Structures are given as C-alpha cells and as structure tokens.
C-alpha cells in the first residue's frame, strides 16, 4: 500500500519453495551487491501469518483494501529491481496479538523463527526485527531473549500501541532494559490508534492516522523519559518522524508550563530528536524531509521502502525522489541508503551477513 494515498494493489500467490540455485535465478551475486541499498523498513507476510490474520477477522487490517501478497522469491526479485542489497524484515500492523494470549505467544515465536529461516537461507539479503507478544509482558521478555540471543534478530519491532500499550508505558521498561543491555535496536511501526472506533472511518488509517499515531506514541516515549533512562537505546521511528519534526518547538515551549511542581526537569523534545533514528519510508520529499533535517542527526537517517504494503513500482518512484532531491548531498544520500544502516547494524558490513 502507498502510505500517502492508501492505494493497495495486492499480488497473490502462495509461497514458493526456493531452489538451491536461487542466487543465479535472482540476479545479482553477493559481490555485486556491495553498493546496494539497505532497506530498514520492509515487511514479510508468510502464508501462515496471512491465515492467522484472516482467522482473526483481519481481512482488511487497518482499513486497507486487502492483505498484500508476499513470497520470498518475489521479494528478492523486487529487491533487485530496487537495488536493495539487504532488507530488514518485520511483521507490520496489526502484529500478532488479536485477543488470545496463548495464540499471540505462539504466533510471535512462529514469525520470528520464519524470519531467522529467511536470514539463514539467503545470506546477506535479509535481516529481521523480532515480534513480541505485548501486552503479555513476561512472555515478551522471554521471546526477546530467544529472538536476540538464539535466533540472531537484528532488534525488535513494537507497534505504536499494542492493545493500548503505548511506547512510554512503564510496563515496557524491562523490554527496553533488555534491548539496551544488548546494544540492540527497537523499530516502531504505526498501527490503528487505540479507541479508533471514535475516529472517522472514511479513509484507510495508514493514510493519515498512522502518521498521527506514530507522533502520539513517540512523543509519549520522549515525554515519559525513556531516552533519559536508557541513553543507549536506539529507537527507529518510521516515515521520517511523522509530525514530530514540526511539533518540536511546541512541545518544548508548552511542557515546562504544564509540568507540575516536583515533577523534575522536563525532557527536551529537541534533544531527544537528535537521539532518535528515522527511516524515510513513505513520501518524505520535499516538505517532511526538510523539516526532519532541521532537527534530526543526519547520521541516523535510513532508507525504507515499506514493501509490500507499498507496491514495488511505487517503491521505485519514491527511491528515485530520494535520489534526485537537492535536500541531500551525495555524501548524505549514500549514507542514508546504506552507510548509516551499516553503523546501526555492524553485521551488515560483512558480505555474508
């Protein structure tokens, strides 16, 4: 789906079992991919996960037209078309918790083991952010340890809210502590806002509400003091920071006025924005990217496609906009497309990562 318009053009087809000579079938050999892009915002939709969505009544998750088709061979071909060397996969909204705790725990394990299988099957082409069964908090920590320590996940993904648990919720503290202790990464992805029944249903929620939801949740993360308590924690915010870049001054102006006596020093949104990491999925050129560059650290910007929810041909056009924009010089553009991701995830510097 194109996040800007809500348009979705699903591709159907069951998962194909790869052949042993798939590197030849899929185009570029490893040594030819050294200059390829690293896509920090890509999704996978294994058939068993699609079936779980359908069984949970999520035929149109977040109001989109349909669940997009996905299989690993098509994904690799589209990555070649996009000049993507490595895609870091994650499960998108609505995640794995549909109301049944046991099912959520089992499904999180299943999608994480599938992510690890893809990484092992295609060295250098895939990484993955592990899914957790939040708000099953104890089980989420167990799954985090298994995914990071055993499966070798590149980090974890947290939805902007998971059944009403936003990123600043104190119950997430054990998860943040585990991630920070491993110098790992939290990738956050928007989902339907909690209480969405009170919102207008006229438009697919990814078009507008996802941007507001990311803004709401990351602001909660900042204002709850998580960056101060875990300074080594690396949070990747999608879609060029949503509305946060243009709200920094307002937050920093009003927060001291609204803080109660005894609450301590108010956190600085502007300082936090320099600490946060941002992918450029969606349509950030020109206005949103200009605003983001005014407040973010350029060394913490990353390419993201949002494939397959953004169709491959739309991904190509959006990447071309990033190639052409005068807001990025050649050095910053190269860093955004691959260098910054190598610094964030050092294992990607290996040709057989």
Pin down the residues of each PLM region.
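Mid-to-C-terminal alpha-helical segments outside catalytic/metal-binding sites
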Residues: 2, 6-11, 16-40, 45-86, ...
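Active-site gating loops and adjacent loop-to-helix segments of metal-dependent hydrolytic enzymes
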Residues: 23, 32-34, 43-70, 100, ...
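Catalytic metal-binding/acid-base residues of hydrolase active sites
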Residues: 43, 191-192, 241, 308
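Active-site-adjacent C-terminal substructures of enzyme catalytic domains
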Residues: 211-213, 230-232, 256-257, 261-312
């Amino acid at each position: 789906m194109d996040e800007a318009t809500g348009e979705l053009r699903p591709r159907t087809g069951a998962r194909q079992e790869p052949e042993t000579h798939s590197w030849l079938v899929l185009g570029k050999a490893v040594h030819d991919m050294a200059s390829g892009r690293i896509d920090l915002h890509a999704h996978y939709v294994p058939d068993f996960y699609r079936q779980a969505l359908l069984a949970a009544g999520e035929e149109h998750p977040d109001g989109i037209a349909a669940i997009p088709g996905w299989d690993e061979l098509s994904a690799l071909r589209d990555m070649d078309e996009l000049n993507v060397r490595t895609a870091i996969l994650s499960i998108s909204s609505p995640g794995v918790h549909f109301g049944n705790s046991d099912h959520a725990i089992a499904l999180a394990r299943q999608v994480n083991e599938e992510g690890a299988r893809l990484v092992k099957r295609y060295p250098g082409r895939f990484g993955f952010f592990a899914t957790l069964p939040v708000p099953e908090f104890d089980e989420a920590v167990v799954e985090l340890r298994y995914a990071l320590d055993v499966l070798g996940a590149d980090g974890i993904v947290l939805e902007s809210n998971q059944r009403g648990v936003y990123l600043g919720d104190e119950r997430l503290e054990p998860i943040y502590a585990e991630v920070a202790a491993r110098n790992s990464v939290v990738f956050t992805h928007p989902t339907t806002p909690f209480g969405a029944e009170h919102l207008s249903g006229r438009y697919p929620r990814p078009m507008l509400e996802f941007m507001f939801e990311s803004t709401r949740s990351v602001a909660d993360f900042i204002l709850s003091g998580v960056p101060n308590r875990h300074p080594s924690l690396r949070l990747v915010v999608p879609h060029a920071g949503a509305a946060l870049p243009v709200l920094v001054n307002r937050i920093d102006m009003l927060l001291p006025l609204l803080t109660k006596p005894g609450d301590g020093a108010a956190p600085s949104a502007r300082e936090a924005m320099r600490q946060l990491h941002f992918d450029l999925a969606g349509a950030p050129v020109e206005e949103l990217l200009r605003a983001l560059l005014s407040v973010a650290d350029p060394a913490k910007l990353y390419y993201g496609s949002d494939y397959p929810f953004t169709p491959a041909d739309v991904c190509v056009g959006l990447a071309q906009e990033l190639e052409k924009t005068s807001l990025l010089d050649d050095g910053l553009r190269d860093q955004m497309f691959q260098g910054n991701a190598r610094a964030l995830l050092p294992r990607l510097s290996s040709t057989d990562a």
